[in-house]
Design a protein with these regions (language model features):
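Non-catalytic cap/lid and distal C-terminal segments of serine-dependent acyl enzymes
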Residues: 1-246
Length: 246
């Protein structure tokens, strides 16, 4: 399994342009952690290749974990691939044992783009008690394949069914940051799902953006905004460079 892990640097903050942080400061406490998921045709390295997520993570004192999921949508597939269990059970244990990250749900977040936005939604909705917020940018919600849609319906990988399940079980769903470019090919399905979530009473921050398609230019903006937006109660919350604006 291929991974990229970003841990804020206590020794050389100026290397990433965070000049106002003392070079000698020590780690105060475990870092809050974001599990950040890539899209179809991408891998664990694309977020760092095409966005400034390293700088944003440093500014926000946030650990970021990125894994490769091939093109398997972060779920369990019939051919034996089980990226769902890896992401939901195995990876968090490994990360907590290897890096100075928090174990508290209040300090744990999940987000992604396109296929990864779908992955963030199904993992966040299957385990709402584990996350303080969910982020989905240009989420690949819905499918044109009728057989696939029928097979997924009301199961653990159906975003609509998971919302209904949480409501029926009276589970509290964490706040959701939901963004999409208005010229994105997925706009209609994303907008429909947003309307469904709002109608169901979920706490949704909706960020439509005119002039953007399914593109890294948009996702670079949104990952910065998401990191500024997320609720924080950790030891670094007051010190982060927060330019909060949505």
């Amino acid at each position: 399994m291929e991974l990229t892990v970003i841990i804020p640097s206590p020794s050389i903050p100026e290397a990433l342009g965070v000049a106002d942080r003392p070079a000698s400061y020590e780690v105060q406490a475990p870092y809050p952690v974001l599990y950040l998921l890539h899209g179809l045709g991408n891998d664990h390295s694309d977020w760092t290749s095409y966005t400034n997520v390293e700088l944003f993570a440093e500014e926000q004192s946030m650990a970021v974990v990125m894994m490769s999921a091939e093109n398997k949508f972060y779920r369990k597939n019939g051919n034996g691939d089980d990226f769902y269990t890896f992401l939901s059970e195995e990876l968090p244990v490994f990360i907590r044992n290897m890096f100075p990250v928090s174990r508290r749900p209040e300090d744990t977040y999940i987000a992604g783009l396109s296929m990864g936005g779908y992955g963030a939604m199904i993992h966040g909705l299957n385990h709402p008690e584990r996350f303080a917020a969910i982020g989905a940018f240009s989420a690949a919600i819905g499918t044109e394949d009728e057989n696939e849609a029928e097979n997924l319906k009301d199961g653990p990988f159906d975003p609509y069914g998971l919302v209904r399940k949480n409501i029926a079980e009276e589970k509290k769903v964490p706040p959701i940051y939901f963004a999409c470019g208005m010229q994105d090919m997925l706009w209609e399905k994303v907008n429909d799902y947003k309307d469904f979530m709002v109608k169901c009473g979920l706490d949704v921050t909706w960020v439509p953006a005119d002039g953007f398609r399914h593109e890294w230019r948009f996702w670079n903006i949104q990952i910065e905004k998401f990191l500024e937006w997320i609720p924080r109660t950790d030891a670094y919350a007051k010190d982060r460079q927060n330019h909060r604006a949505v």
